[in-house]
Amino acid sequence: MTRVPAAPDPMIQAMMHSSPVADAPLVREPLHAPVAHLVRGGIIEGIHYGSVVVLDADGRVRFQLGDIEAAFYPRSALKPVQAVAMLRAGLPLEGELLSLAAASHSGEERHIAGTRRILELAGLAEDDLRNVPDMPFGAAVRDSWIRAGRLPSRLAQNCSGKHAAMLWTAALNGWTLKDYLDPAHPLQQAVAATVEDLTGQRVARVTVDGCGAPLFSVSLHGLARALARITSAEPGTPEARVAGAMREHAEMASGSGRDVAALMRAVPGLLAKDGFEGVQVAALPDGRAVAVKIADGADRARVPVAAAALARAGVDPALLTEFAGEPLLGGGEPVGCVRPVRALDPVPLTACG
């Protein structure tokens, strides 16, 4: 179900909004552009469409490709913003557990144990969670679960840390728990107000994300602006606490071998978050930021396009070679690759066959 957002509680709105908020982005068919080519043997075999925005430290658009102003769903790329909202509402998490609250985790034992710990601190249990039961997101972890005959679990589902943190935030404020995922719940009203505050625009639509939580529609430009405000915030603020926790505990926010964790390790000071359906956002401490949406949701395009966007933002390309794109195989040997279009990456990070 998709709905136009209701007017937020005035008290919550006043508490959460710290800057002017523009009108909601238009709900329209996005005017995506080619962002990556599938090159095999020197021939363009396929094209991935999408949109890219690169922001300077002062918030101005340095580069754009496609449609950066249409309403879209950031999916899990919005989790750092949701975590900021919970800290603003009194959630006392820090360190690896705060990183887990903003995670799309792989379902490793450390993620499950961390989620249990958040619930214990809140005086709650797994049965209080309302996210959907699922197998672990990480392929290797999921395979081991299947071999062991383990069943889908709310704790293993990749958003469980966020849901545990939402429950604790609700409990701390005396809000009801059973309906914490209702968009009209005070917790979700606080999240919506923080989304609007950090993106600088009204929410266009509210629907339900895969985990069951409300999902807020903003623009790609707004998503980049939000992460820039998080990474450039003053020390000690909720924004700075979220950014610091996710950077310091990158694998807690994702998992072993995940590209977003590797990207944060490779680029000093970078905060990065991915989302289903080909979404990526990343920002540096000075406020430079990028956001990417791949129209067909392909991760094979998301990673190299995000790397090329970071190079456009001024990141040393030598730090990004690991993210230049997976090879295309022919007969078991590399014969090409997925490469950002020339408009985005005039000097490709890697050669294609």
Where does each model-flagged region fall?
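Active-site-adjacent helix/loop patches that line small-molecule binding or acyl-intermediate pockets
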Residues: 3-5, 9, 14-29, 96-203
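Beta-lactamase-like hydrolase cores
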Residues: 4, 9-69
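Short, flexible loop/turn motifs enriched in small residues
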Residues: 44-49, 78, 274-276
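Short active-site loop at a secondary-structure junction
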Residues: 48, 63-81, 96-97
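A short glycine/serine-rich beta->alpha loop
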Residues: 65-73, 102-105, 148-157, 208-214, ...
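Active-site SXXK
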Residues: 74-91, 110
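Penicillin-binding protein/beta-lactamase superfamily catalytic region
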Residues: 185, 202-251, 281
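Structured C-terminal helix/loop/strand segments within mature extracytoplasmic catalytic/sensor domains
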Residues: 231-353
